[in-house]
């Protein structure tokens, strides 16, 4: 909504599942967070300058009333999965443009649309559901949810994943977006 919620448009994303949250990632780029680890990358197109990609679902939405009545937007939707089947609950934009996402069953993901063009996902060994995430800097976060607030480090999760110590049970996944 461009007018702080006074008017809305409904757009068919083509996604059959539930969406739990969303975030504006950049000008004309939005991430929609869904169930089972699914992310929809929605890109707003300028219909006078860009042709929609044939391999992506395209949606059209128009405002119906208010000061934007009749204003229409064209979006393409790219479906991605973070590498695991855990629902996603919250997202924040980091200082460098990446997106940090919290999710159920210990999931923390970092989406990099521009540099690495990937999604890195940690599934914490505690498997506690996370409902929100706060950036502490240096790839460290506060995650809140089941059983309170915890500090999380993506680099520590990766070190735990590659460790030979059987007591460390974190999992780490990388999905290529290019």
What is each PLM-predicted segment?
Residues 1-178:
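Residue-level hotspots at or immediately adjacent to binding/recognition sites across diverse folds
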């Amino acid at each position: 909504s461009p007018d702080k919620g006074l008017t809305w448009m409904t757009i068919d994303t083509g996604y059959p599942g539930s969406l739990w949250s969303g975030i504006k990632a950049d000008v004309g780029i939005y991430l929609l967070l869904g169930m089972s680890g699914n992310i929809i990358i929605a890109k707003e197109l300028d219909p006078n300058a860009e042709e929609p990609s044939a391999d992506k679902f395209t949606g059209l939405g128009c405002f119906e009333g208010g000061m934007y009545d009749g204003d229409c937007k064209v979006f393409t939707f790219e479906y991605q999965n973070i590498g695991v089947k855990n629902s996603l609950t919250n997202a924040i934009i980091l200082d460098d443009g990446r997106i940090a996402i919290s999710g159920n069953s210990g999931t923390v993901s970092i989406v990099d649309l521009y540099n690495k063009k990937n999604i890195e996902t940690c599934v914490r060994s505690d498997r506690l559901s996370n409902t929100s995430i706060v950036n502490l800097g240096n790839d460290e976060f506060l995650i809140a949810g089941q059983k309170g607030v915890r500090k999380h480090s993506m680099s520590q999760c990766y070190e735990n994943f590659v460790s030979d110590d059987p007591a460390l049970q974190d999992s780490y996944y990388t999905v290529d977006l290019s």
